[in-house]
UniProtKB/Swiss-Prot annotation:
One of its GO terms (biological process) is tRNA 5'-leader removal. Keywords: Endonuclease, Hydrolase, Nuclease, RNA-binding, tRNA processing. Belongs to the RnpA family. It comes from Mycolicibacterium vanbaalenii (strain DSM 7251 / JCM 13017 / BCRC 16820 / KCTC 9966 / NRRL B-24157 / PYR-1) (Mycobacterium vanbaalenii). Consists of a catalytic RNA component (M1 or rnpB) and a protein subunit. This is Ribonuclease P protein component. It is an enzyme of class 3 (hydrolase). It comes from the Bacteria. Its EC number is 3.1.26.5. The keyword Cell wall biogenesis/degradation does not apply. Residues 1-20 are annotated as: Disordered. HAMAP family: RNase_P (MF_00227).
Length: 119
């Protein structure tokens, strides 16, 4: 489970990250990253978007748990000012955690290359 300080909870944070952030698509997920300019941030924050297109409630919660686990694994690679939103695509319902983690790492690396960010 993601620690509370690393969870994105406000809709304004989600909206800003999705609309102003850099996007990278993978087969199972779309990742958005925005570098926050607030200096008092306790660390990177991660939010999930798992819509009904992914499946019924049981399938959506399963995907959410897997994505949270994958996000926890890459948390240490993120800058403290990073805001990351992970949008699950319908294919993610059949994905296993290692594949989701690899796709998340690949997407974040693509974003780093596009923005020229050091971490």
């Amino acid at each position: 489970m993601l620690p509370a300080q690393h969870r994105m909870t406000r809709s304004t944070e989600f909206g800003a990250t999705v609309s102003k952030g850099t996007r990278a698509a993978q087969p199972d997920v779309v990742v958005y990253r925005l570098r926050s300019d607030q200096t008092a941030d306790p660390g990177p924050r991660v939010g999930l978007i798992v819509s009904k297109a992914v499946g019924n409630a049981v399938q959506r919660h399963r995907v959410s748990r897997r994505l949270r686990h994958a996000a926890l694994a890459v948390l240490e690679d993120l800058d403290p000012s990073d805001r990351v939103v992970i949008r699950a695509l319908p294919r993610s319902r059949d994905a296993v955690t290692p594949r989701l983690e690899q796709e998340l790492r690949t997407a974040l690396e693509r974003i780093r290359q596009r923005t020229g960010a050091p971490s």
